[in-house]
């Protein structure tokens, strides 16, 4: 992408001195705004299929009686496929990067790479989730997986983390 000063794009390509640099396409954007893509800073992409599912319930009841039992039945392929569905929705609204905090981070990463979506995977650290060793392995593996993928630790919620867990994370 080159946002120029009104000079000819081919002339710009030649001026760079980079061999083989040519413009594939030139678009006159005069009178328009060119913006970077939006970033969704908190997603659970594969939950796209659960939208409006028992949404008239209090949070804890909704989680414990509806969401957690449904999630227990989801496969890795479900997470992959539903993440791809969510990515289609993101792209139609200008979202080009997500911070995904859902289950099965390797499948989310694979779906994002296959769809060309930038993703920061955030493990929702909590007292019920995987051990810190698993989190460390994910950190090392997923951060090397693909340039579109990053991994970081994140706190699920204050009510699902103990003080001891947070202290252990700070020592990592």
Regions flagged by a language model, labelled:
Residues 1-35:
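Histidine-rich, glycine-flanked metal-binding segment
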Residues 6, 103, 124-125:
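Short, ordered loop/turn segments at secondary-structure junctions
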Residues 6-8, 39, 51:
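Residue-level structural signal for beta-strand termini and adjacent loop
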Residues 25-27, 39, 120:
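Hydrophobic/aromatic beta-strand patches that form the interior of the parallel beta-sheet core
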Residues 31, 42, 50, 94, ...:
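Divalent metal-coordination and catalytic microenvironments
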Residues 36-48:
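Histidine-centered catalytic micro-motifs
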Residues 51-116, 136-145:
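Alpha-helical scaffold segments that flank or form the walls of functional sites
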Residues 108-172:
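Metal-coordinating catalytic core of metallo-dependent amide/deamination hydrolases
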């Amino acid at each position: 992408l080159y946002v120029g000063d009104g000079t000819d794009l081919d002339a710009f390509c030649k001026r760079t001195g980079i061999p083989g640099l040519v413009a594939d396409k030139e678009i006159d954007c005069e009178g328009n705004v060119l913006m970077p893509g939006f970033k969704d800073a908190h997603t659970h992409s594969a939950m796209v299929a659960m939208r409006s599912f028992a949404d008239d319930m209090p949070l804890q009841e909704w989680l414990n009686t509806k969401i957690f039992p449904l999630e227990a039945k989801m496969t890795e392929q479900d997470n992959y496929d539903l993440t791809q569905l969510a990515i289609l929705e993101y792209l139609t609204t200008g979202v080009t990067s997500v911070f995904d905090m859902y289950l099965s981070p390797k499948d989310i990463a694979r779906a994002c790479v296959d769809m060309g979506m930038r993703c920061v995977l955030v493990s929702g650290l909590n007292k019920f989730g995987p051990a810190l060793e698993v989190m460390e392995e994910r950190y090392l593996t997923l951060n090397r997986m693909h340039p579109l993928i990053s991994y970081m630790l994140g706190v699920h919620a204050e009510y699902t983390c103990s003080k001891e867990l947070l202290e252990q994370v700070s020592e990592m």
